[in-house]
Amino acid sequence: MVAAKKTKKSHEGINSRLALVMKSGKYTLGYKSVLKSLRSSKGKLILISSNCPPLRRSEIEYYAMLAKVGVHHYNRNNVDLGTACGKYFRVSCLSIVDPGDSDIIKSLPGDQ
């Protein structure tokens, strides 16, 4: 029960930081634009939902490894990631280009 509470707390922290990025920062949503941001070395952090297809996930992780960018696996599905972004559609992956006022890049355990 304590572990469930801790994960809920951490989701709230990630969601609030993500909302701040959506307000004050720059980001790209979607698979193709995430790959573009990785190839052009603009992305600082990548978030991938839990139900992102394995082939897409591995391709994003490969490009992120080449670009030396951190990848965070969001523990919820793409509907919840879209809701956390304040969107009314599903988001399987997103790239944070400029975090703005948020400290999400320092706070999330990415592979940096």
Curated annotation (Swiss-Prot):
InterPro entries in alphabetical order: Ribosomal_eL30-like, Ribosomal_eL30-like_sf, Ribosomal_eL30_CS, Ribosomal_eL8/eL30/eS12/Gad45
Disulfide links within the chain: none
GO cellular component, one term: nucleus
Domain of life of the native organism: Eukaryota
MF annotations from Gene Ontology: mRNA binding; structural constituent of ribosome
Key words of the record: Ribonucleoprotein, Ribosomal protein
Family per record: Belongs to the eukaryotic ribosomal protein eL30 family.
Name of this protein: Large ribosomal subunit protein eL30z
